[in-house]
Amino acid sequence: MNLTVKSFGIITFIAIVSKLLGFGRDTLIAAFFGTSATSDAYFIASIIPTILFASVGMTITTGLVPIYANIKTKSNKEASQIIRVLGTLFFIMSILVTIIFYIYTPFVTRIMAPGFQQEQLELTNSLTRIMLPSFCFYVLSAVMTSILEYERNFVPPALVTIPQNLFIIIAIVFLSQTYGIYAIAITTLIGAFFQVIIQYPSIKKYNIIKFDLHFKKNRKVIKDTLFLLAPMIIASVAFQFNAVIDRMVASQLPSGSVSALNYASKLMYLPLSIILLPLITVLYPSVVDAAVEKGNSLCKMLFKGINMLTFISIPLLIVMFVESRELVDFAYRRGVFDETASNMTTNAFFFYSLGMLFLALKEWLNRFFVAIKETRITMYTSIISIILNIILSITLSSFLDVGGIALATSIALFTQTFVLLFFLPKKLVIEKKIFLAFCLNHIKLFLTFLSTLVLTKALSILYQHQYVIVQLLLTTFFTLLLFIGFSYLYKVTELREATNRFYNFK
């Protein structure tokens, strides 16, 4: 357990550094380009590589782990050889996919941004084609990440986004005046290449990064792997398609809506990426091991993960709800990012925040279903989610503008999470005692959330400060103080366990 806590601490620290750089990158983009037609073109152009990586790259990162773990129980050498073959296959496929999207870029961008004028579409096409080859490097990086994380070597995968963010920051400051938005696109591609370079020294000892074309010899494993990954890819594409739908609808709204939606989603993802996803990352290899061993610890780990994610999310959500405008102003309010841009972004950010916990829980539940090789469930629930999101985005944006689009996403995430929970008893034997304890603890967590939210909101009205940073610090301090106090009052299990771990760790 101490090793898990230590790993979580290390990758959380790296994630903070990475996200601060990423946030600095986004802040500079906002300051230099604002919510303009140029920034809209860049954000639409980045969707295709992002969707390809998030749907295929993240699927590889998650899906290869149980395959590698199963084979490794029999032979380390065979496990490495299989990963070499699969890695080669994925890389070849990524090149083919890149070529196809390169050819059909104008068609795809016109679908994603139907409200763009011709000049804006041409800029979007150029930026997209520059960034598309990054997908090939992302696939190689994903193969490396899956093995390193299973081997509990979390540091190199956590470091991969740092050089990319640094390159983009340098490009914005020193090159954007000369090359404009193209400087960001080019450095995005360079940064993707460095994701492979950073992980290579650590992955070299596992002997998996070599071209191995023995596809026929490993036909059965390849077939089983593709059958496992295919539903995951469909599920990931469906989830990423939500972002496309959001931006398609936003492109029909007033100019700058796409950028406001992008800035808001990145602000919402900040605590998710820094705290919640690292926790899922360090726990996932243990979930896979428990699934391979087929013991009774899998059920306990599942509910424990849900409890921990909910517990950690509560103070984050309260600060986001109470100080949504202040967070947006602190993050972006400079340069050409004016009052109008701030209003639009705040509107979207508040409603995106409603879905943060459900996004984290969805990721955790999806990992569980991957570990037990029931990936079709993740596919079905993702399809339900995207259909709901399309209907709600179109409907709610008529009333709430970009806020309606964000609210639609949050409602879709909420629905998907509870459908995944519905399938749990069908795939896992759940002890009645464990389930009752889980339900009781969540009642306590809900009471803690409600009590802390009401008092924090009341206090924030009383101590309004002219400096945004002071206001945010005060709200965060009172939120944490009240959260710990109510957790103690309601006897929340996670507070007691966190206290015990702290003293044991010391």
What label would you give each PLM region?
Residues 137-159, 354-384, 395, 399:
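Membrane-interface junctions at transmembrane-helix termini in multi-pass inner-membrane proteins
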Residues 98-118, 318-338, 458:
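Short membrane-interface helical motifs at transmembrane helix boundaries
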Residues 1-4, 200-239, 300, 426-443:
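Interhelical loop/hinge segments that connect adjacent transmembrane helices in multipass membrane
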Residues 457-506:
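Membrane-proximal transmembrane or re-entrant/amphipathic helices at the cytosolic face
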Residues 58-73, 276-295, 366:
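Helix-loop junctions and terminal segments of transmembrane helices
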Residues 155, 163-197, 376, 384-422, ...:
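Membrane-interface helix-loop junctions in multi-pass transport and translocation proteins
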Residues 7-27, 191, 195, 199-203, ...:
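Transmembrane helical elements of multi-pass membrane transporters/channels
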Residues 116-144, 337-365, 451:
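Alpha-helical transmembrane segments of multi-pass membrane proteins
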